[in-house]
Every structure is written in structure tokens, then in C-alpha cells.
Amino acid sequence: MSKVIEMKEKVVAEITEKFEKSIAAVVVDYRGLKVEEVTELRAKFREAGVEYKVYKNTMMRRAARNAGMEEMVADLVGPNAVAFSYEDPVAPARILNDFAKNHKALELKVGFVEGSFYDEEKLKELASVPSREVLIAKLLSSFNAPMANFACLIKAIADKKTEQEA
């Protein structure tokens, strides 16, 4: 086997492994982005612990098939990049969607999140979901609200009794 084919097979195996290990993978069309914009996007990904790579489409197609992500194959045309997340399933979609709002050249294509296929519409919906921390804060505040109301009620009753005694 030639060295070129061996190298290509190695890259396909690497991409397949990333698809299998990641909890989220989002493919974007980056055509028209300037170098500074791509650098800015990569910095945002780095902060969030997301890996952003550009691979040849033929290699990504083979890797997607190997990883059982057939739905993705049809959309792997044109200049594509893929963002892999191993911790936060929403981070790649959120970062890319926010970035695309200010940079019209960036286009969300498809993705997989925890084994489920997402098209562009679903990725945008996913990106609008608040972060885990925000959701936990909302949940805790909803638990806290009845207790706070009860405490205010007790205080009002105590104040009323104090007024009646005086």
C-alpha cells in the first residue's frame, strides 16, 4: 500500500474516532470568512473546550459512514469545517450560531448531538437553549420562590401581631 493511502486511512480513522468520542459534532460552511474571523472563531472554541478542524470532504464522508452518521454524508460538499465537543453538547452549536449572526459568510449545515442528527433548523433551536448553569439557576430560583413567599407571609403575620399588641 502506498504511503499516501496509509496517511489518508490514518486521517479517516482519526476523524472516525473523533465522531465516535465526541458528544456533539457540527459541520459548517466557512466559505467567505477572513483569516482574522476564523482566528477569532478558533479562540472562542478554545475557551469552550471545542475542537475545530478542516478536513477533506471525502475523508469526512468515509469517517461519517464508519461512525454510523450516514445522514451527514449528503451535506458534506463545499468547503467544510467540523467542531467537536467532548463535554458540552450545546457549545459548538451555540458558538457557531452566535458567530454566524455577526458573520453572514458562516453557514451552519448539519450536526450530531448525543447520537441524534440535527439539520440547520434544529441546530439553531439547540443553540437557543440556555447553558446548563443558567438552567440550574432557573430551577433553583423556582424552588426558592415558594419558600421566599412563605417567609414573607410569616413576617407579615408577625408584623401584624406586633401592631395589634401595641
UniProtKB/Swiss-Prot annotation:
Q: Quick one: a GO cellular component term?
A: ribosome
Q: Name one GO biological process term.
A: translation
**Single GO MF descriptor:** large ribosomal subunit rRNA binding
- So which domain of life are we looking at? Bacteria
Keywords in alphabetical order: Ribonucleoprotein, Ribosomal protein, RNA-binding, rRNA-binding
Subunit description: Part of the ribosomal stalk of the 50S ribosomal subunit. The N-terminus interacts with L11 and the large rRNA to form the base of the stalk. The C-terminus forms an elongated spine to which L12 dimers bind in a sequential fashion forming a multimeric L10(L12)X complex.
Known function:
Forms part of the ribosomal stalk, playing a central role in the interaction of the ribosome with GTP-bound translation factors.
Q: Belongs to which family? A: Belongs to the universal ribosomal protein uL10 family.
| Annotated protein name in UniProt | Large ribosomal subunit protein uL10
What is the source species?
Alkaliphilus metalliredigens (strain QYMF)
